[in-house]
Amino acid sequence: NIFKGWNRSESRTVVTLKQVPVFKDFSQKEFSELEKLIHHRNYSSGDYIFKNRAPGEGMYIIMHGSVKITIGTRENNENVLAELGEGDFFGELALFDDEPRSANAIATSDSDLLGFFTQDLMALQERNPVLGQKILFNLGGVLGERLRGTNNLLIQTQSNNIE
């Protein structure tokens, strides 16, 4: 094929996915397969993407915009856990268990998100087990990094309280 290796312009979806550590070592073919499973969602500033204790359906990747992750039920009792921007992802624990959400996710600007949901991961596991395992393995690595960061923060906080 004379077009083999020809560099077509990538979709915005693939450009965004390439920024996400979970998909860091994917081939173009794997990105094409993954792109078929992605759901596009749009939120206005102030919209809840999900609420604490709601059923978890999957993870979201920020293509454009910003999102804050909070705990607490009222505006004046809200603790911001994270402020996220383009290329960041959240809600990934829903891909591993059936537990309800442990926080709120709220758009802080008009936002375009990519959704990757549990049912799509399950279907991918059946159709292409190698790619499904690659996603889960990479997600596990990211979760491990986040847990280490949380542990270090906890140790630092405890050290500051002792002093």
Describe each region flagged by the PLM.
Residues 1-163:
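Cytosolic regulatory regions built on CNB/CRP/Popeye-like sensor folds
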